[in-house]
């Protein structure tokens, strides 16, 4: 994201960290399941995808083995994160069924699924609602100029297509996470306009749990030749986002992409009160290992922030879930405090 000169000039080389706050920051104890890495989009900043047909799909038996192993781990969320099969591909139905079956298996194994699998049809979203406590899709940036650059070969990154997902999630009463990718060629006003659009949709549907502010972080697989988003600018972006978004939307940042501990604290103090799903591997940014919960506590506690686990669905949305899902969530609300 390009920032006006006046904004850049105001950015200090040291974060403005205040006095101990006695505040709370949250995270979700999570594990990521990837049904497939294959994706028909070719976003130039991507470090996740493989070409269609080049990687195998996760089998249910392999997932069952993973879920069995996780029974003794402190994990509540199963993030189903998938590459995208084209909506008109003959493999689309099998792909969707695999995602549904993995969600169902996660539930029966005692976990809480959250799916992010790119744009879905209304019927697909409706079906997945029955086996997910929440879902998500990044807006990234809504400016159409990115369709000429980083999204030139990414048909599902059409802004109107992704906005439609947020509207359908509202219609279906699906607790939803969305977010922005910072530093992929957008301008500063593009960022604010995307946040304002999210705010307006939430005021209509009241369904957005979290907005992720994810700084572009170069990886070994991408072809996009651009530096990492400047972490010194992130607290300022967070503070502005906090002004734009309704107070009941939580701002989330990925802590492994803010590698300076002081700047991570500055981001939390600026208003990013959630650190996302913490698991063994960041599948989207594999070159940046996750900081684990104890490491994050060692950073946050000395400056007055308590790190607290949460579920992948916020309490105000429990009533939107089926009775079966509500029962699973109730069990976890009693357990997660012991993590």
Curated annotation (Swiss-Prot):
Protein name in the entry: 7,8-didemethyl-8-hydroxy-5-deazariboflavin synthase
Binding locations of [4Fe-4S] cluster: 39, 43, 46
Pfam families per the UniProt record, alphabetical: Radical_SAM (PF04055)
Gene name of the record: cofG
HAMAP family: FO_synth_sub1 (MF_01611)
Cofactor(s) the protein needs: [4Fe-4S] cluster
EC number: 4.3.1.32
Function as written in the Swiss-Prot or TrEMBL entry: Catalyzes the radical-mediated synthesis of 7,8-didemethyl-8-hydroxy-5-deazariboflavin from 5-amino-5-(4-hydroxybenzyl)-6-(D-ribitylimino)-5,6-dihydrouracil.
Residue ranges of domain Radical SAM core in the record: 25-256
Species of the source: Nostoc sp. (strain PCC 7120 / SAG 25.82 / UTEX 2576)
Assembly: Consists of two subunits, CofG and CofH.
Pathway: Cofactor biosynthesis; coenzyme F0 biosynthesis
């Amino acid at each position: 994201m390009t920032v006006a000169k006046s904004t850049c000039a105001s950015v200090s080389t040291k974060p403005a960290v205040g006095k101990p706050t006695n505040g709370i920051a949250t995270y979700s104890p999570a594990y990521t399941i990837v049904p497939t890495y294959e994706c028909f989009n070719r976003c130039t900043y991507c470090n996740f995808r493989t070409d269609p047909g080049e990687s195998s799909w996760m089998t249910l038996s392999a997932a069952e083995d993973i879920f069995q192993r996780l029974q003794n781990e402190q994990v509540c969320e199963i993030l189903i994160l998938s590459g995208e099969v084209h909506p008109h591909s003959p493999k689309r139905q099998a792909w969707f069924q695999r995602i549904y079956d993995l969600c169902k298996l996660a539930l029966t194994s005692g976990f809480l699924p959250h799916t992010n699998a790119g744009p879905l049809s209304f019927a697909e979203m409706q079906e997945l609602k029955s086996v997910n406590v929440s879902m998500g899709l990044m807006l990234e940036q809504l400016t159409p100029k990115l369709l000429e650059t980083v999204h030139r070969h990414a048909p599902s990154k059409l802004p109107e297509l992704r906005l439609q997902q947020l509207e359908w999630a509202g219609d279906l009463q699906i607790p939803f996470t969305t977010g922005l990718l910072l530093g992929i060629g957008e301008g500063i006003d593009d960022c604010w306009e995307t946040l304002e659009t999210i705010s307006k949709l939430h005021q209509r549907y009241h369904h957005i749990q979290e907005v992720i502010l994810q700084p572009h972080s170069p990886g070994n697989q991408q072809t996009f030749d651009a530096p990492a988003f400047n972490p010194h600018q992130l607290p300022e972006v967070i503070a502005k986002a906090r002004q734009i978004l309704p107070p009941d939307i939580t701002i989330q940042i990925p802590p492994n992409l803010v590698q300076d501990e002081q700047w991570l604290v500055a981001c939390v103090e600026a208003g990013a009160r959630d650190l996302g799903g913490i698991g063994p591997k960041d599948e989207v940014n594999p070159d940046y290992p996750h900081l684990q919960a104890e490491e994050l506590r060692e950073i946050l506690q000395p400056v007055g922030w308590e790190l607290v686990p949460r579920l992948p669905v916020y309490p105000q949305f429990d009533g939107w879930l089926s009775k079966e899902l509500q029962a699973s969530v109730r069990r976890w609300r009693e357990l997660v405090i012991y993590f």
